[in-house]
Amino acid sequence: RVSIRKFQDKPVEPEKIEKLLRAAMAAPSAGNQQPWEFYVVTDKEKILELSKATPYSGCAAGAPVVIVPVYRKEGLPVQDMAQIDMSIAQENIWLETDALGLGGVWIGIAPLKDRMALVHDILKLPENVEVFSLFALGYPAESRKQQDRFDKSRIHFVE
């Protein structure tokens, strides 16, 4: 999988969006707490607002879809693990995006409180959830090759 930051002006089919969210919700989570909810943004004006949420989110402006994963702030058996759980769910979305012939880019929001609050306000989210990230996606308008990042020097065996 690679980060895709340029998208075709073509909508993503609802069936494909559902497959992405099914992949996310298939993720394991600490204590099986499944802390996630997902906001699927297709409104161009809202996407434009979200694209200004961070210094690195400008690429979202051209995406037909932005998925905003959020997690519950309270009532989780292992609250401290919620962001790790969200990372696993987010990666599942990314892998499924690639499998469906789509492209996407993960835009970090949490744990930076100012970014979390800004996205929360833009989408008028309920008070009981925290914003985890933005995931801009669509049909790729660019082609990028996966780089081989394998580095044996980073592997250490303890025998």
PLM segments and residue spans:
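Acidic, surface-exposed loops and disordered segments
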Residues: 1-159
